[in-house]
Curated annotation (Swiss-Prot):
Keywords: Amyloplast, Chloroplast, Glycosyltransferase, Plastid, Starch biosynthesis, Transferase. It comes from Aegilops tauschii subsp. strangulata. One of its GO terms (biological process) is starch biosynthetic process. It is found in: Plastid, Chloroplast; Plastid, Amyloplast. GO terms for molecular function: alpha-1,4-glucan glucosyltransferase (NDP-glucose donor) activity. Coiled coil: none annotated. Its main location: plastid. It is an enzyme of class 2 (transferase). Its EC number is 2.4.1.242. Pathway: Glycan biosynthesis; starch biosynthesis. This is Granule-bound starch synthase 1. Belongs to the glycosyltransferase 1 family. Bacterial/plant glycogen synthase subfamily.
Length: 21
């Protein structure tokens, strides 16, 4: 996942979700 600070956690969740989306 990419991003900085807390935002990285948001992208991590998106990547783990199906169709990410």
């Amino acid at each position: 996942a990419t991003g900085s600070g807390g935002m990285n956690l948001v992208f991590v969740g998106a990547e783990m979700a199906p169709x990410x989306x």
